[in-house]
From Swiss-Prot:
Entry protein name: Cold shock-like protein
CDD domains reported for this sequence: CSP_CDS (cd04458)
Any single Pfam family the record assigns to this protein: CSD
Lineage: Bacteria, Pseudomonadati, Aquificota, Aquificia, Aquificales
CSD domain boundaries: 5-65
Amino acid sequence: MSFRGTVKWFSKDKGYGFITREDTNADVFVHFTDIQMEGFKTLQKGQKVEFDVVEDTKGPRAKNVRVLGE
């Protein structure tokens, strides 16, 4: 199941950040390896994204993250 959300913050130096889900306003962890794009994988604060959610040992994690409208 796919969800939509907004990038809350993302550190290109550390390679991770958080996305706020539209439906629940919950924050979901995102790692750069889960971003679906060519080249350097990074996100910008405020970007709209679509993603899947899996349960990780530390909580929910975004997978197959796709930037919308680009």
